[in-house]
UniProtKB/Swiss-Prot annotation:
The gene is bioB. PANTHER family: BIOTIN SYNTHASE, BIOTIN SYNTHASE, MITOCHONDRIAL. Pathway: Cofactor biosynthesis; biotin biosynthesis; biotin from 7,8-diaminononanoate: step 2/2. GO terms for biological process: biotin biosynthetic process. This is Biotin synthase. It comes from Leptospira biflexa serovar Patoc (strain Patoc 1 / ATCC 23582 / Paris). NCBIfam families: bioB. The keyword Iron applies.
């Protein structure tokens, strides 16, 4: 293994493009390949050929008082999801160990609800401290609205990142949620930043927004100094208030490129919808983004770890673990692709 990776906590590199240029890219006024080439140049400048794999742990599902139109756990939603209260520290610990064994760079705990109580924060802090101390694993928490006191408690426990997505622009926000505001989200991010927790915040593309909304989010995240940006592509499933999504793989790559060019030194993560919306352009996306999720999302299945590792190998890239890059990864051998499991027709006459 190489030495432990040292991460920045605040994005500091200036944007490569202006708002007007970002709009031109999204409108398709600039050919795709030159855009990807420029975005890829920045990706490799700051992250080399490394890819960070994140695994989500949905530690509380449902029972949410918020009415976010993009969420299957929303108040009044009829998604049929399995609802459960906050997992025990023992359950979360076992999930973290499994994520570590599977090669996750960061363990992301997600809980439903408006925000955690003081008691819940204390329990989460205890769990974070154990994962950090005994597994040496980086931890990200997404638990809703947070104030300064709770943020400090989590920071003192060793929390590496706090996730609170902007999801869309301020002008669009009241169309997707009425139980809290865009300002509430900004206040939470500012509280986490004040506590010196690295910020993780991104967008959900495909909820009926205009191109200018996407650009506004990209530059708002830059203003906040967000160092980790998940770019999600909306998946309309039962229970969502929003049911339409018209995205193409080519457009999704353009979106990822815009976020990279606006936030050159931020971790750009291909989030939910990677498999369905990017399709055969998933490999191209990795030349722009340097991070992705494996083993699924909150209430939607995704690529398993083996598929994700194969994608990384095919791009001649390497997975970045908490301790660094595993030895021997460069010894790429494609013969495993042609085993009986993947190509049974080649073996059907085998004696």
């Amino acid at each position: 293994m190489i030495a432990e990776v040292q991460e920045k906590t605040i994005s500091s590199s200036p944007s490569i493009i202006s708002e007007e240029e970002a709009l031109q890219i999204l409108k398709g006024e600039v050919p795709l390949l030159p855009v990807v080439a420029k975005a890829s140049e920045e990706r490799f400048r700051h992250f080399g050929n490394r890819v960070r794999i994140h695994i989500l742990d949905n530690i509380k599902n449902g029972y949410c008082p918020e009415d976010c139109g993009y969420c299957a756990q929303r108040k009044g939603g009829e998604s049929g999801i399995q609802e459960y209260s906050l997992k025990s520290p023992e359950e979360i610990w076992e999930d973290a160990k499994k994520a570590k064994e599977n090669g996750a760079y960061r363990f992301c705990m997600v809980t439903s609800g408006r925000g955690p109580t003081d008691k819940a924060v204390d329990k989460l802090a205890e769990t974070i401290s154990k994962i950090n101390g005994e597994l040496g694993m980086k931890v990200c928490l997404s638990a809703g609205i947070l104030d300064g006191k709770k943020a400090k408690t989590l920071k003192d426990a060793g929390l590496d990142r706090y996730n609170h997505n902007l999801n869309t622009s301020e002008s669009k926000y009241n169309e997707i949620c009425s139980t809290h505001t865009f300002k509430d989200r900004l206040t939470t991010l500012e509280a986490a930043k004040e506590a010196e927790i690295g910020l993780c915040s991104g967008i959900i593309v495909g909820m009926g927004e205009e191109l200018k909304d996407i650009v506004q989010v990209a530059f708002e995240l830059k203003r906040l100094g967000v160092i980790s940006i998940p770019v999600n592509f909306f998946i309309p499933i039962k229970g969502h208030a929003i049911q339409k999504s018209t995205l193409t793989p080519e457009f999704c790559v353009r979106v990822l490129s815009v976020f990279r060019l606006v936030n050159p030194d931020s971790e750009i993560r291909v989030g939910a919808g990677r498999e369905g919306h990017l399709g055969f352009l998933q490999s191209m996306a990795l030349y722009v983004a340097n991070s992705l999720f494996a083993e699924g999302y909150l209430n939607v299945k995704g690529s398993e770890m083996e598929q994700t590792m194969n994608l990384i190998r095919d791009c001649n890239m390497v997975p970045e673990f908490t301790e660094g890059i595993p030895e021997g990864w460069e010894d790429y051998d494609s013969k495993f692709l042609y085993d009986e499991k993947n190509f049974p027709e080649l073996y059907k006459h085998k004696k």
